[in-house]
Amino acid sequence: MEELRERVWHGSLNVEIMLSDSIVVPNTPLSEKCYHIVVLRESFLALYLPAIVRKLGNNVIVTYENPYKQWWFEYDGVPVPWEYPCGVLFDFLCNSSTTSTGKEDDQRLQMWKLKLCHGNKYPPGILPLVDGLRQVKDHWKHQWKQACFILNGSAKRIMSLSIPDFEAFWQSLISRHQPDYIKVREKLLTPNKTKHIPIRVWTADASFLQPSIPANSDTMTLFDVMTSMDIKLQENNRAIIQGIVICSDEDIINLYDLFASIDGFLYVVIK
């Protein structure tokens, strides 16, 4: 179990960032308008913006204030929100996955091709990044407040964390130090007293659902959760968690324990 958690924590994606045609300097060589980077599934795209803009920023025709404000990503012409973990976005937008038996396809080799865009007007669905890293941190804390409320019936646990504990929690994401992350995360959970499971479901038709799933009932499987939302899992309609196709008879509490993301939610992508 610990090995699986560690694999989830260190899971990564190969990403190609290409400057949007609308902002790139004409006749820029491909090598200077394209950047290949490895991002962690359990991270946020916004955290990579400074490095990306530093690499590509000299080849744009726009004037920009900083590496966060008025920048966004697109995939196949669709704006990509920064506020969800990278792995969740990849699972929803791309087709690659790993079976629950461990047999892998080309996920590790597949390149996630994103366009880097800039403009005064954000496209619909994009949360403006006006306060840089602080905004990412505040958003992440707000997500954990929601998750704690669902788990415990109150956000008191995260709100009562000491400043050093909360800073250690945040820095564990930046420094990728899993033991520090787990140490603080355990303070936010109440084993055997969980009220509901923080779960978010992205359906094949792009609907985003957040069902109320009680944790104190008899064993509830992924199939039960999907059935409660009138979602049928079939060969051509699979549930993907952390890049893995999950069997429908898996216990939902165990899935949360193993695969909950860095913002406290278990994300299920239906494809």
UniProtKB/Swiss-Prot annotation:
GO terms for cellular component: Atg12-Atg5-Atg16 complex; autophagosome; mitochondria-associated endoplasmic reticulum membrane contact site; phagophore; phagophore assembly site membrane. One of its GO terms (molecular function) is Atg8-family ligase activity. The keyword Glycoprotein does not apply. It comes from the Eukaryota. GO terms for biological process: autophagy of mitochondrion; cellular response to nitrogen starvation; piecemeal microautophagy of the nucleus; protein transport. Its main location: membrane. InterPro entries: Atg5, ATG5_HBR, Atg5_HR, ATG5_UblA, Atg5_UblA_dom_sf, ATG5_UblB. Disulfide bonds: none annotated. Keywords: Autophagy, Isopeptide bond, Membrane, Protein transport, Transport, Ubl conjugation. It is found in: Preautophagosomal structure membrane. It is a peripheral membrane protein. PANTHER family: AUTOPHAGY PROTEIN 5 (PTHR13040:SF2). This is Autophagy protein 5. The gene is ATG5.
